[in-house]
Amino acid sequence: MKPAPFRYARAGSLAEAIALLAASPGEAKLLAGGQSLVPMLNMRLVRPAVLVDVNGLRELTGITPAPDGGLRIGALTRHADLAASPAVSERAPLLAEAARHVGHAAIRNQGTLGGSLAHADPAAELPAALVALDARVQVTGPRGAREIAAGAFFRGLLTTALEADEILTAVEVPAQAAGWGFVEIARRPGDFALAGVAAVVRVGRPLTLPSSSLGGEGEVRLVGFGVGDRPLRLRGAERVLAGGPIDAGTAARAGAAAGPDCDPPGDVHGSAEYRRHLATVLTERALLRSEERRVGKECTVLCRSRWSPYH
């Protein structure tokens, strides 16, 4: 099939793009990488009156390190650029790893961060990573600019807090902790995940081996994707870890507690029961990888600061 007729407009500025959306309320769509929109146009699942091309807007580009250790990432940043950016790998390695899991090379070269977030596919990697990182989504519209916590941005299947006349402009990512894990299961490389988990572990107290106590001085954020209608905080698993160590035993118990928070779909690729089982296994794996990274990095820093003559 081919798209239904539409008018094409290439915006020359953010203000012009907003005006074009406002001129066709509810009947305009933004074109960035087109990796989700174009197939939907071809299948006539969407029939916009106007297609507003925003690819020329410099206001939506760039990966900028922030003084606090975080990042500001423009909405037009391609997945491949996220994966290859030294700044992202250093300051938000979970996000870089998630970007490497997106589709195939052609999709990563064309698809954009903003497009993935605005489309809000519940099996997509980048939304889950940004919820785990406690990022903030910046949007601009006729009423001005506002910020939305990533956890509140995704409201359901292909549904976000973005108004029809607003444009997602950038994402603010806070400085990431040393402990993180990102795991997913797909039928083939490049396929949408049957299930996946993103984990971030922050510990505010001195390093304690062989395990780390979280309690009130640290935080663990676990987010499942492909297991509900949006990126889901696995709060049951998080509660298991409150005030205790992260080790093989607690990771396994946290994994078991993740299942009840999930409401996965069932289809020809995997039953709901199977996807829920995947969530329990992947939660355990993501936690153990997070702790391995955290302890490894903190051990390196600790050893260098105390004993290395070259530090």
Predicted regions, residues:
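Positively charged, low-complexity/disordered segments
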Residues: 296-311
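C-terminal structural segment of proteins
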Residues: 1-214, 218-294
